[in-house]
Amino acid sequence: DRRQRQMCIRDRIRTAPEYLKALKVKSQIPEIKFYSDEETVSLIVKERKSLSRFGDGEFMWMSGESMVSFQDYSAEFASDLTSAFKSDNENLLVGIPHGVFDSSKCNLYAKMHWRIIRANFLSRLVKFMDVNRVYSDASITRPYIDYRDRNYSAKIFDLLKRIWDKRDVVIVEGEKTKLGMGNDLFDNATSIKRIICPAENAYSKLEAIKSSIRLNVEKDTLILGALGPTASILASQLCDEGYQFVDIGHVDVEYMWYLRHAILRETIEGKYVNESGVKTCSDVYDNDSSYINSIIDRVLS
């Protein structure tokens, strides 16, 4: 709407000086190896690998920095993130944002964002990275709003749908996330169940969430996590226990934006979209029978 467009324009104007400053920073970009998105999905589908994703926020926390966010900082939280990132479990794929190294497919605003991240955060990323490791692209679950080509977005969404094709799925999500409600994203899954977790500070319930999964989820079931940085940790720790956990992040929001031909990170009725700048959402899906019947546990208090 008009208000969101105005907010977006103001944000881009505010970003411009930081971007111009970032252009002057000559970053030494290391040679980091990446799986293609096709290779990542193939490994998840054929070899049942898990995926843990890390962005600039996770690297800030790992570096000991707190920030205004939906997740409070603690030393234990940072330690668990770092352990997940450095995991040597061969069944765990670790994702980092490919845009930091190559943003050629991105739109102008995303290119500005990644250039700023490269200038300000690359040194922090590098100290955690293993140049001998092959990483996945953490942005594989965000194939729309930052990209110029809708055909590319359509291709990646079709690719992602292979992950849960004909699989029994348990979604571990925040209580306002409601993955798949209002769209057909998961229609090709055999079944969808949910474990509902806190929308904010989910890490405080980490052990309770793991206990719920152990109690309610069979190990041949695919777990999809949409729980911020807590999902990054869960992917690693549950992979160590023999589960397949894919940190799927913002995929549902990105898909809704794609269906709407959105040009901004706009609100979506009935879903909490933290990037829209709006902290509330309607209860449009709260009494939906398909949503209610899919819930197998709530880990909230």
Model-derived regions, located:
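Structural motif
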Residues: 168, 221-222
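Electropositive, gly/pro-rich neighborhoods at or near active sites that engage anionic ligands
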Residues: 10-187, 300
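C-terminal functional extensions of proteins
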Residues: 230-301
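Glycine-rich beta-strand-to-loop/alpha-helix junction loops that act as flexible
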Residues: 226-228
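Single conserved hydrophobic/aromatic residue that forms the stacking wall/gate
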Residues: 1-11
